[in-house]
């Protein structure tokens, strides 16, 4: 029986029938404003509360900004960094400016996937990480989409090999039907897609689990909200043809 890794996000583990199977790599796909980053950070924070060390790979935002944004939800990771439970991999600044003074793990050349993997592997080793978030994986192949699946598989090999359960944040444009990059959906164990739809003149958030290797899961689209404590998913409600229905 595969061990389950609880997301700790209210309602989400019900939809996943117990959590994400250990070592799975999950693509968290969605357009702008859908809540991808918050979901992934909440997954890491909840892991820390369960005693599971975690790593956040920052590709889209300055690491300082990431820490500030997390703290707004009450997720202050600095204490865990000092205790060797949490690590930030800076793949945003390339070590320019003051980052090299503050950040321990820096990727200097994003076009060199081997350097990226080596820095990530070192961070995993140092803190014995159990959870990893890459935000966003799309940045790694935005200029070379043909390599998307290859890059995903290289990362998956390293992460699953070290026993980590991982979330790859994947960006898609508004209205796009795919998951962000050609063939990426075939290189991961799970896909959770977040959406933002207009219903009766109001934007509503929802998510659906497209696939999750190693477990059954809800096949319905469930609404969720972003609160001041993070994401809350409603497993007893379904978004259907522009309406939210109670189950």
Curated annotation (Swiss-Prot):
Q: Which residues form the KaiC domain?
A: 3-247
The protein in question is named: UPF0273 protein PYRAB02580
Q: Which family does it belong to?
A: Belongs to the UPF0273 family.
Q: Which UniProt keywords apply?
A: ATP-binding, Nucleotide-binding
User: Mind telling me which CDD domains this protein's record contains?
Assistant: KaiC_arch
Biological source species: Pyrococcus abyssi (strain GE5 / Orsay)
Cross-referenced PROSITE patterns, in alphabetical order? KAIC (PS51146)
Q: What one GO molecular function would you report for this record? A: ATP hydrolysis activity
Which InterPro entries does UniProt cross-reference here? AAA+_ATPase, KaiC-like_dom, KaiC_dom, P-loop_NTPase, UPF0273_KaiC-like
Q: Which residues bind ATP?
A: 30-37
Q: Which Pfam families match?
A: ATPase
């Amino acid at each position: 029986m595969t061990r389950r890794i609880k997301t700790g996000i209210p309602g989400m583990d019900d939809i996943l029938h117990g959590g994400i199977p250990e070592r799975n790599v999950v693509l968290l796909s969605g357009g702008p404003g859908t809540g991808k980053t918050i979901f992934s950070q909440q997954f890491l924070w909840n892991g820390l509360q369960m005693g599971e060390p975690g790593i956040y790979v920052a590709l889209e935002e300055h690491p300082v900004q990431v820490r500030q944004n997390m703290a707004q939800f009450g997720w202050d990771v600095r204490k865990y960094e000092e205790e060797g439970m949490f690590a930030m991999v800076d793949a945003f600044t390339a070590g320019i400016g003051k980052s090299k003074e503050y950040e321990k793990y820096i990727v200097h050349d994003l076009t060199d996937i081997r350097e990226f993997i080596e820095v990530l592997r070192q961070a995993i080793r140092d803190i014995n990480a159990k959870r990893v978030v890459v935000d966003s994986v799309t940045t790694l192949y935005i200029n070379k989409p043909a390599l998307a699946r290859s890059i995903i598989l290289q990362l998956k090999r390293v992460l699953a090999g070290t026993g980590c359960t991982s979330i790859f944040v994947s960006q898609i444009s508004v209205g796009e039907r795919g998951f962000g990059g050609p063939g990426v959906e075939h290189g991961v164990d799970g896909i959770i897609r977040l959406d933002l739809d207009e219903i009766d003149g109001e934007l509503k958030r929802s998510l659906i689990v497209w696939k999750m290797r190693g477990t059954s899961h809800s096949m319905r689209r469930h609404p969720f909200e972003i609160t001041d404590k993070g994401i809350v998913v409603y497993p007893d409600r379904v978004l259907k043809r522009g309406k939210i229905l109670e189950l």
